[in-house]
């Protein structure tokens, strides 16, 4: 299985054994680390590109504002046009005490500014003809569409982990930790490593305890050799070659990593990680015949801490943790990043779907916005409103307990109770339809939606009564 994942030339290099040193002896092991470096460096996740400020979403919000009641619209006129939410709340503390519109305030002000002037750019482009239905008639459907679009727009926000962290930043952080450790520090822009500073001893830097700390660390230890035959490339590593006993060269890492072959530009992060780990699993121990240690590369004298040894000894990581290659710290970090990548892909797909649905909702809203007076509601808009109401109130009928239920047998037991003295079928206590809060609406007995400030039941039941009008 692992062989099938590897290019034939790379596999041949990895499996090449032999007891005699030769130029490029360390290259098979170096190719493994370069593949891991490519995954951790060149496959970082780009910043989230999904734009929550979709023009279609803005149109939905503007339509909702342009047909809102005059009392709601004028809240955002005058001094409010320039005020932050905290300034507005302070200036109107008595009138709006207990209300918090901080999350939506700036957007609402923007919508009012864009729709206030009948001759403005947005109103000119989206002019409602004189024969269109009245704002009061179209508010319920457009409001339902705006609510649905608001819910969908949340899927356009940058994804987060289960504990609330920025998902992309977390993936890239795992990759960064896999790249550098110990004597190597993250480079500017967090795209590589720098170091080592000074000239640390290889004997104390490249111990089995420190092996696997990062991909860069293992590259440094593998390729910092004085022997001419133990090279990570056919041309050597230049100024990274130790030149004083067991001392590593200052800032030698940049000369080592520069010898890595360029990885493929195509492919995903999981594909790059899978290839690197398959190469690692195949290469471990193959160049060290007779050794029970899990060594990557070839030891010159039974150890990987000398400058005549081109290897990394992972024996301690295998023997202590009993976790296979996942006991190697940088391997574990790559696998963690890979696991998070699945959540990232799901979020991208959800955002793409949400964007498409918002575009469709904008089309429905525009048809309703221009619906002729006296005509039937746009079927798509009706379906949208019904779907929203089902989500809000459940699929139950709110008028099950009516005067038509003349007898106890006709009175539904699930939601109603029969009063034998008055011969009435009425809702059970606790099941009556009530206002439920900001963003949710009730329908009065006359069947007309509450669309103005003065007739809204939410005014009487919640300090956030206005918030239901615009989402």
From Swiss-Prot:
Its main location: membrane. It comes from the Eukaryota. It is a lipid-anchor; GPI-anchor. Glycans are attached at residues 64, 405, 450. This is Variant surface glycoprotein ILTAT 1.21. A lipid is attached at residue 454 (GPI-anchor amidated serine). Residues 455-471 form a propeptide. One of its GO terms (cellular component) is side of membrane. Residues 1-21 form the signal peptide. VSG forms a coat on the surface of the parasite. The trypanosome evades the immune response of the host by expressing a series of antigenically distinct VSGs from an estimated 1000 VSG genes. Keywords: Cell membrane, Glycoprotein, GPI-anchor, Lipoprotein, Membrane, Signal, Trypanosomiasis. Residues 406-449 are annotated as: Disordered. Residues 412-431 have a biased composition (Basic and acidic residues). It comes from Trypanosoma brucei brucei. It is found in: Cell membrane.
């Amino acid at each position: 299985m692992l062989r099938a994942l590897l290019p034939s030339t790379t596999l041949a290099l990895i499996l090449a054994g032999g007891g005699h040193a030769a130029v490029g002896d360390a290259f098979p092991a170096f190719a493994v680390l370069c593949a891991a470096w490519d995954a951790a460096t060149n496959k970082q996740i780009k910043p989230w590109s999904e734009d929550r400020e979709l023009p279609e979403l803005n149109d939905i919000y503007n339509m909702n504002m342009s047909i809102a009641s005059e009392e709601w619209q004028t809240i955002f006129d005058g001094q409010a046009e320039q005020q932050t939410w905290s300034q507005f709340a302070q200036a109107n503390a008595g009138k709006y005490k207990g209300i918090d519109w901080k999350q939506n305030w700036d957007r609402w002000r923007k919508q009012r500014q864009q729709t206030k002037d009948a001759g403005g750019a947005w109103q000119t482009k989206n002019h409602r003809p004189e024969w269109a239905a009245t704002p009061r008639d179209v508010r319920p459907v457009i409001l339902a569409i705006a609510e649905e679009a608001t819910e969908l727009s949340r899927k356009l926000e940058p994804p987060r982990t289960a504990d609330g962290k920025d998902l992309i930043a977390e993936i890239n952080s795992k990759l960064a930790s896999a790249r550098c450790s110990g004597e190597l520090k993250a480079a500017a822009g967090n795209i590589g490593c720098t170091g080592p500073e000074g000239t640390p001893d290889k004997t104390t830097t490249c111990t089995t305890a420190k092996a696997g700390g990062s991909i860069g660390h293992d590259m440094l230890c593998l390729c910092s050799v004085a022997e001419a035959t133990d090279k990570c490339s056919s041309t050597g590593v230049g100024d990274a070659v130790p030149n004083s006993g067991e001392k590593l060269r200052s800032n030698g890492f940049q000369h080592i990593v520069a010898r890595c072959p360029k990885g493929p530009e195509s492919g995903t992060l999981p594909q790059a990680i899978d290839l690197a780990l398959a190469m690692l699993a195949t290469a471990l121990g193959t160049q060290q015949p007779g050794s029970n240690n899990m060594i990557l590369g070839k030891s010159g004298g039974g150890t990987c801490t000398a400058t005549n040894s081109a290897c990394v000894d992972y024996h301690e990581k295998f023997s202590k943790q009993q976790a296979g290659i996942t006991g190697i710290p940088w391997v574990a970090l790559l696998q963690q990043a890979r696991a998070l990548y699945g959540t990232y892909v799901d979020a991208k797909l959800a955002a793409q779907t949400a964007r498409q649905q918002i575009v469709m909702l904008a089309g429905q809203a525009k048809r309703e916005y221009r619906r002729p007076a006296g005509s039937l509601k746009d079927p798509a808009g009706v379906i949208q409103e019904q779907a929203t109401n089902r989500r809000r109130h459940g699929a139950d009928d709110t008028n099950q307990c009516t005067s038509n239920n003349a007898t106890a047998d006709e009175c539904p037991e699930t939601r109603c109770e029969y009063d034998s003295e008055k011969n009435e079928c009425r809702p059970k206590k606790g099941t009556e339809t009530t206002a439920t809060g900001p963003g949710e609406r009730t329908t009065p007995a006359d069947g007309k939606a509450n669309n103005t400030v003065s007739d809204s039941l939410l005014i009487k039941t919640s300090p956030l009564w206005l918030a239901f009008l615009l989402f």
